[in-house]
């Protein structure tokens, strides 16, 4: 178990994944986001939806938008659809994955 440099609760399970920040060699750096898992069908991959609010000055109103992120899901964390997770930026793991799950906080379902 290695220290990733962030104050998060380490997973209880142990995995053999090379791309795990806790048990493998993947280093994390950059932005940290929190969102809800909307899809977990891919192999060690999840899709995260985040709500972003923006101000439109012309109408003096706020708008809600959702953005999606594709992140690597290590077997030791194993987040499922409906979980609230914290992801952090890392080197590109694949063509679309540049984030990795570092903590699973709660389940909304």
From Swiss-Prot:
Q: Name one GO molecular function term.
A: rRNA binding
Q: Which InterPro entries match?
A: NA-bd_OB-fold, Ribosomal_uS17, Ribosomal_uS17_arc/euk, Ribosomal_uS17_archaeal, Ribosomal_uS17_CS
User: Which GO terms are recorded in the biological process aspect for this UniProt protein?
Assistant: translation
Q: Name one GO cellular component term.
A: cytosolic small ribosomal subunit
Give the stretches traversing the membrane: none
Please provide the record's keywords in A-Z order. Answer: Ribonucleoprotein, Ribosomal protein, RNA-binding, rRNA-binding
The answer to whether the entry has keyword RNA-binding is yes
Task: Name the family the entry cites.
Answer: Belongs to the universal ribosomal protein uS17 family.
Quote the subunit structure annotation: Part of the 30S ribosomal subunit.
Its function, per the record, reads:
One of the primary rRNA binding proteins, it binds specifically to the 5'-end of 16S ribosomal RNA.
* Protein known as: Small ribosomal subunit protein uS17
Organism per entry: Methanococcus vannielii
